[in-house]
Amino acid sequence: MANNTLDSISAWMKDPLNNVMLGWDSIVVMARHEVNYLLREEYISRFSSDTYLSPISGEVPLLGGRSKESIHDFILDAPRLAFSNNDLNKSHASLTCAILGGTQVTMTNNVDTWEAVRVIRIDPLQGPRLTLDLSLDSVPGIVDLDGGVSLDLKESDNFILTFAETIDDRKLGGNFFKEWFKTLPDSQRVWTLASIGAGNDNQMRPQSFKIRTQTNPAASLDRAAPDYGDGAVLVFIRMQGNQEGGDIPVEYRYLIPDDAGKNYSATVLFDAKRLAKAALLIGSFIDALNAVLVDFQFDTVYDTGSQAFEVIAYGGVLRIFTSEKELPFYFEGELVRAVFSNFGYRLPAYSIRPLMIKQTDHDGAVLTWTTTYLDLSYFTLPDNMHALEMRQDVTVDLRCTYPFAVNNNDLVVIPVVEITSSAANVVIKENPTIINGKPVDYPPLNQQIAQLKAEYSTVNLDEHNARIWAKLRHTLVPAVSVTSLIHEHIYFDHNRTLVVDVIRAPRDIAVFGRINPLRADFSISPVEHVMVSGSVHKFVVAPAGANVKWAVEWLQGDPEDYGAINAAGMYYAPVLPGDTSFSRMRITATHSTSGFVSSALVTVVTSQATLNPLIQVCDVTRTAELAAGEVSRGELLWSVKETASGEGGELRPSVLPDGDHTYIPRSPALRGKTYVLDEIIITSKSNPQAQASAWVLVTQKVPFLTIKLAANAAAGQVQLQAFANGNPLDPTRFKVNWEIGAKVTGTISDTGLYSVAQNTTDRFVLIFAWAQHSELGKLEGHIILPLPLARFARELGMMSDKTAP
């Protein structure tokens, strides 16, 4: 049952005890779910190759200082802004950037060297996210000259990068980006939210704003209910030349109506005084008065912004022409035509109180004028016999204000006029009544004369007032469309997607409508789609059968090959090279009749599934986290492929926030072994071809050998050397054996020279080394090298023997 109807909101606004505008010039209230949908549409439609920031690389030391995350060529997605549903006193928005590409290597210090213990290759199917909070109390709201509404993110906080397991390490990653964020120019740090119509009137040009979020008090508390979390985004706007309004109380009224069947999703309030100032411009009054007053002369007073706000007349007259009223009667069987005449007169603009028009804070504009005229009236019988001759000096006091009213759902200005007149020096001369040369004593005629005499200074003055107002009323109402003026200022994107349904004027002005109703009439599906390189997907529009023109636009990737789409909406994705993780395109459908455009964002990926980390080292007493993504976002089947029967660990759903799956090593540690190497495999339940694997190297004990890089290796090669207790193994005493584990990629010689395979797309190599000791038995060690080697010179340097020449 509706309990927040449009009528109840209007009644609340009408009550003078309620502070509706809180000192702000305009308040825009939008349903939060519609705003977030609109932001997603804007995100897609504004997407371009310029949206991407340059790839980011660097090091993030983790808590304790023993480990660091080395990030390489992180590609940030365009930021997505969304409003969370909080109360007015703790309003927040969040900005999320997915990491679409790059490599992450976790480095851990081992006494005198660093080791790579984890390698992650990021793509659009699986990767971390960068999130930050915008406390809407502290983020400055900016409106540029074109009406663009922007949020300057320099005041944002709580940067979180989900590239690590603990919240402390995630914050450290976020701080890395926070510091980097500060170095960005305004063009990349200031996020454009939408557009407020700036119009052509400085008085209605937005200058700044505050954004708040509000919970719908009628929303269900049941998480399963369709209206759970329902709420609104409120934008409080200050126009140029005004001060910002006051604080927004927590108990402020929820202003989106819930009338059954109406689907209202937006309400816009305008301060009536501010709107009146914009609608009732002094210049339009001057033009109107010039058209009706003879030789109108005036002085103009300007405000500090060079805007006329007062006009005072010092010359000119208003002419009222002679009016006649026939008063026929029958006398002795004949029709006698008697006439009551009011002679014309002139009302001087400069008189007792000169005609003045002034813009005010209360009524928008007010016209005042006190003037005098001489009223001459005659009651005349045939043969020009004046039965009555009357005259009086009349003082007229005129005041006109301009409140708003709603007429046929259109906001109009209806002038409210007050005209009072008073008479002085009244002279009435009554002459004998003569008809056809004969004196007449005819009772009906005598009664008419008596009535005219009695009403001369009362009813007759009212008629004069009506004549004056009839002369002024078409000219003192400026030719302005207030509704059109409102429409100029209430669209919140370039497509003007806020549609007005109802306008009310209960003191201030209220506009009730819907956000983006066109999407219910015409939209592309799916709005976002991920597909595999070389595959085909059919896009559709609703309603089915709509006549549209399809197009595809390159955004990121190979600009020479971004696929094609036919007239039926069938999109053919390009074939991506093996070293390219993804490419992005925009699909557009343009309606042939309305010209309305609906867009979809397409991400083409090389792999059907991704599993990360590609490899990681895990102590037998600990666990390892893994995360996967599949192109269809469907259910995945997880399994462990043991390299030795009975030694493998197991998988369980992760209990960590944002976690996916946890690998648990088999325990206790196996005696006589240094390593257990398990392969983790994911397979799409609906598409067995969508498969990916990763490796977990479980250390059963601390490896005896440490593998370091020796200097002076050729391009594409690294020379490895085994160390024990900080010293290289003596080749005269120990034969070191080398072996490539996990995925075999490249080659390694008997002397430990590793050579990368040509044109490989592998992102790591695991190399084992072992030597036989006469007393201690088999001594083992390992090293993980990120590939390709040339991209990871910094990490290779950290793994090098610092004593080597």
Regions found by a protein language model. Give the residues of each.
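Hydrophobic membrane/lipid-contacting segments
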Residues: 2-183, 187-454, 487-519
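Solvent-exposed, low-complexity, repeat-rich "mucin-like" stalks and linkers
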Residues: 456-457, 464, 516-558, 600-646, ...
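Intrinsically disordered, low-complexity segments that are common in secreted/host-exposed effector
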Residues: 522-530, 535, 552, 571, ...
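Conserved small-residue-rich
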Residues: 259-343, 523-561, 569, 614-641, ...
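A short beta-strand micro-motif common to beta-rich folds, especially ectodomain repeats
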Residues: 575-595, 599-602, 665-689, 760-785
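Disordered regulatory segments flanking catalytic cores
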Residues: 675-681, 685, 693-700, 718-721, ...
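Extended, charge-rich low-complexity regions and/or helical-solenoid scaffolds
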Residues: 454-526, 600-610, 698-705
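Low-complexity "stalk/linker" and mucin-like segments enriched in Ser/Thr/Pro/Ala/Gly
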Residues: 527, 549-574, 639-664, 739-757
